[in-house]
Regions:
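N-terminal nucleophile
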Residues: 1-159
Length: 159
């Protein structure tokens, strides 16, 4: 089954789920689907960012992560841990750069960092880095943050 066919099946059931973004890839094809709208879209080669909106929504944290990744790629071939470090930033965006998403601006600023922790009720749970080599090898590392246990668990997969 092709990625596009798979996502078309998911699209038919999109109302069964809370909001989500899903990336699906095979060989040199990467597709994204969001049940927020927009349908199945092909992702062109390049640097992209994804948060709790559509792919490449120009939120400060998305733009900052894309810029940081571009800098990292200019200087070396990043390792998974380098990529995960980019996503652990707790730096908050200035209020004047924040989008108006309908929540209070103080909360908007609190959640404007790459890594979010708002007391015990909201925040980053999983951070995932993926490297897809020119030779076709794929490596994925995901870190799960469990604040109540004050621990991080990580999973690594490669093929």
């Amino acid at each position: 089954q092709s990625p596009k066919d798979y996502l078309k099946q998911i699209e038919e059931k999109k109302k069964d789920y809370n909001g989500f973004n899903l990336l699906v890839a095979e060989k040199e094809e990467l597709l994204v689907f969001s049940n927020y709208g927009g349908g199945v879209q092909q992702v062109p080669p390049g640097i992209h960012g994804l948060s709790n909106a559509f792919l490449n929504t120009p939120w400060p944290k998305v733009e900052a992560a894309k810029a940081d990744l571009k800098k990292l790629l200019e200087h070396k071939s990043p390792k998974l841990d380098d990529l995960l470090t980019l996503l652990q930033s707790k730096e908050k965006a200035p209020i004047e750069l924040l989008p108006d998403t309908g929540i209070p601006m103080d909360l908007e600023q609190t959640i404007s960092s790459q890594f979010i922790r708002v007391e015990d009720y909201y925040g980053t749970v999983n951070t995932t880095a993926l490297c897809w080599g020119h030779d076709g090898t794929v490596s994925i590392k995901e870190v799960r943050t469990i604040p109540e246990k004050e621990v991080n668990e990580s999973t690594f997969v490669s093929w």
